[in-house]
Amino acid sequence: MIVKVCGITIAEDALASVAAGASVLGFNFYPKSPRYVRPEAARVIADQVSVLRVGVFVNEAPGDVVRIMKIAGMDVAQVYLGALPAGVRTWRARNVDATFDAAELSDPAPEAFLLDAPAPGVHGGTGHMFDWSRVPSVPRKIVLAGGLDASNVARAIAIAKPWGVDACSKLETAPGRKDHKRVRDFIEAAMAVHV
């Protein structure tokens, strides 16, 4: 089980998340996000950790995704909307809304799919949940996101049986600032589940 703490904006939160057991950190490169971090600032943080570093992109041109990933020192591009860039590891992020079709998960291009809760005009970090029973049983890596925290992650894992889980806003005191106790509690709860 991988555990991703997303919306990292400062080194203190990155280091605390890794110390608590996070195996993946997410950095948001969508300028309209309250958790947006400049690629150069993300690089300073990313260079201090040895876990998987995922850059979050929304409808960004593939060439720009690759350029930002190099500047920021990211390992994987998590892409909401738009084309997947070639030559880099990718996760396709998809909101599980009324238009969600499990057949989309057969696309061989991304190495994983991140399934998130829908919210009009917002891409991740909303704190909203979706019906976890809608996550299909497929032979693909699925990362479950959307309103997860220590109080519900075990139930979400039991229902959806994902490869990984991702949390952001439910671990914060303010957008982009993590509550380290909430981070620890979330990671402990996720890692305690055996599926």
Residue ranges and their predicted role:
Residues 1-195:
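Conserved N-terminal beta1-alpha1 strand-loop-helix module at the mouth
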